[in-house]
Amino acid sequence: VVMEVRTRDIWSLRPALQFGRSGGRNRASAGFEELNFLGLGMQLSLGYSSDKDRDSRFAAFRAPQIGHARWEFNVVAANNSDGHEYRLGLARPFFALDTRWSAGFDLLDDERREQRYRHGETIDRYLDDQRGFNIQAGWSPGLIGDLTQRFTFGAALEEHRFSAVAPIDGIGTTLLPEDRKLIYPWIGYELIQNRFVVEQNRDQMGRAEDILLGWHASARLGLAAGAFGADRRAWIYKGALSYGDRPNDTQSWLVSSEFSGRYENGGSAGTLSTIDARYDHRFNAFTTTHVRVRGDIGQNLDLDQPLALGGDNGLRGYPYRYANGERSALVTLEQRFYTDWYPFRLFRVGGAVFMDAGRVWGDTPEGPDNLGVLKDIGFGLRLANTRSGLGRVIHIDIAHPLDGGADISKLQFLISTEQSF
């Protein structure tokens, strides 16, 4: 018997010093992360972050496994310049396809100042005081053939209380979203096809990537009513469906869709439907063509639920939340390059050239944007930190907008830390 074992050194304790820029907005953070606290596999992070919206001092702790049990525990606390954020969760998840049961709960207390944007500029501000709670349990017959089915149920609270804020730089509260308090029991279903493939140099560099192909579907339905303490009667629903395939060693594709919203007062409210498709063609071990198409359709969106495109979510050559509306489409063409360059055995180096094109339709409280199709081109560097156990990739991009107003910078410089290439 011949056995080959490959290992990779990971720095569990590391400083976290980051600077980012997208959509013409800077952000920075400093702190440290420990991925193996006390040698027990627990994760601890402390730090400070700052961006245009808020300054934050935060602490987070996560125990992915308590003792020899499969229970996960996590807690987050953040003291922000505009409020606070507290999260607490305990869960025994479906940790494998053959896992038979799950249970857990989570709590949320989040207060923050939110902004609305038009053409990349802040036009409105308000305070969002959010409370959330969810308790759930689930059962599964396990993996039968190549399919796993899971049945879940629980109860949830989703509450948003909105209030006006004092003006900052002359911009305060003009329009205030409507308060919402939804308390409801719910039931859920999930189907997973056991069809995984292992790839490398797809969304990471030099790491094995488990890609789920085949079918994956989930749905959840709940009913809020005054008898439960809600401020309205509403059906709350959400779901997702995806299917992928790899017909040969050089091509793969994945199509996914999601939807969420409410049905109240005889019509839909806060409804958002998304379809996302990607295609990857690998020419060799060092270059891949990546194509992605995404569409979003909103219906009676809540005021605190804006739909926008900009430098922060796909249109890399444009300011933050530049185009706003009720429906959007985005196409990305990207040629990815992977190299063997491994400086100081710290970072794997790659690159990309890209073109983005997007459009937003529909109305806003200030009227339609009517910006038409917005396009940009650019190139960038990718750095994958091999000493981190989190699989993060540093993006350094330069993008040039081909459309838009004369007030837009002709070069957008973007730095971000992402979970994929």
Predicted regions and their residues:
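Outer-membrane beta-barrel translocator domains and adjoining extracellular loop/strand segments
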Residues: 30, 56-61, 85-91, 103-106, ...
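Outer-envelope beta-barrel architecture signal
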Residues: 11-15, 26-28, 40-42, 55-57, ...
